[in-house]
Amino acid sequence: MNDVKSCLLVGVGGQGAILISKIMSNGFMKAGYDVKQSEVHGMAQRGGSVSTQVRWGKKVYGPVFGKGEADIMVALEKMEAVRYAEFLNPNGVAVINDYAIKSTTIASGAEAYPEGCIEAMQKNFKTIAVPASDIAIELGNPKCMNVMLFGAMCDSLGCPEIDWEQVVAETVPAKVKELNLKAFRAGREAAKAAK
């Protein structure tokens, strides 16, 4: 518990990065860690980039970290993984939703969606890529993709003393608790299959 660990959550507005950061923060605080978190919303309401930083350890002095300092990056959209790759340390783990959201310029044909996002990450970092959006749709609600991806990254946190399933159950709204627990479990299984 002496070392401070850092996680960067990135995605597009509305994908649920902030809920993941709340789940993480709740779990770490219950386990006795000092936790700090920071959110950058940008143009989130217009489909813009969103990033959240979560840091935990015995004593954390600030919520923000710089380039090359994230131990884990969770990307809810694969192009966002590449966009924020410079924040991941060389020994870090990238957990990526194998899903593309096309911006207005890409949808209009003015730009092309970049090819090989996941492959680019795999060349430089330990990478766990899972089809979180597809699995969430199979579970009945695409909005649970974020919790599914959280399940996929859970083992990378290195905190086996935390009952993350219980933390998810206590953090998500009651009306979607069972769906999110299914998503969490599916994420853990998908990560095992992706390794």
Model-derived regions, located:
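Active-site cofactor/cluster-binding pocket
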Residues: M1-K195
